Amino acid sequence: MDDFFDGDLHAGISNIVLEPEDFDLGEGVTIRKTYAHLMAHFVMAFAPPPPNSFHPGPWKAAKGTSSFAVDIAADLCIPSDREKRFSIAQTIAFMLRLGINPAAVVAAVANHPFTSLKGVPDNEAIIIPIETLPRMFPLSSENDVATVESLEWIKDHWVSTHALIQEYPEFALAAAAISTGQFVHNAALILVSLWAALEALFSPSTAELKFRVSALIASYLEPPGEERYTLQRRVAKLYDKRSSAAHGQPSFRSQDILDTFNLLRRVITSIIENRHVPTKEELEKRLFGCSSG
């Protein structure tokens, strides 16, 4: 994607409300309020086009749910001197979903600020739609406002989070699963993909997966005691739902999917704040109350 952009990359974020007019995320990256409306509608023509021209009218608009329209409310700018600009934009958008509003999406990327695109000649403007599919399992937040405090959290952690995604395939899978799970059209596949991410992080072997994964997750998230035991039992029950989904037995509910999203979100947040993906040895030492040093 970076090949399309010689200069700055502007990612248009939807479903987010910035509290400040603009905010410096560090490393030259900024986010600021903007407005643009991205739309796409299916239209049918009834005659072939002449050479090097368009289909002649009349045209008819197609009805249905496949049209797309969204308001872009924030312009995330990744400067030209940064490598992997699109990957950085994806990481920050993932953190906006994780920490502020799970409905946040990168609707489009452009090579100019969205406020000035209307004045850029057509042959110079590049606008590429990105996340345009409907969300089949939409997650939402009671508050979609990106406060200064929540943006400070992203500022403090996006560089290390991007490095973890680049270095650890299991963490990259977890980030992808929680980011794309809402767009998967099959509920069983959502549940299986979320658990695949958890297993990649917490399964040292294929033996006794249910107990091992649930015990390691609980020991990672809770100190020894009653809360760790209670969490292990809850996670083990969720794992049963994963198994039924994987074997085509729809004995799970929407709440089970939501609970698994929240479990993975909690794990990812802990990894981000620790700036470290735990090794299998560290997890097993933690399980038995040993020092990881």
Residue positions per predicted region:
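Composition- and surface-driven signal marking solvent-exposed, interaction-prone regions
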Residues: A177, L194, K210-S214, S251, ...
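Generic structural signal for hydrophobic core residues of well-folded globular domains
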Residues: G181, H185, L198-S205, Y220-L221, ...
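Short alpha-helical scaffolding segments that buttress acidic/His motifs in well-ordered protein cores
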Residues: A174-G181, W195-L198, I217, R242
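Histidine-centered, metal-coordinating catalytic motifs and their short helical/loop contexts
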Residues: Y229-Q255
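Short runs of predominantly hydrophobic/aromatic residues within well-ordered alpha helices
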Residues: F171-A174, A187-L194, L198, K210, ...
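Charged, non-catalytic interaction/linker regions at domain boundaries
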Residues: M1-L189, R266-G293
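Flexible secondary-structure boundary motifs
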Residues: V192-Y229
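Residue-level recognition of alpha-helical structural elements
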Residues: N186-I190, L209, E227-L231, R253-I257
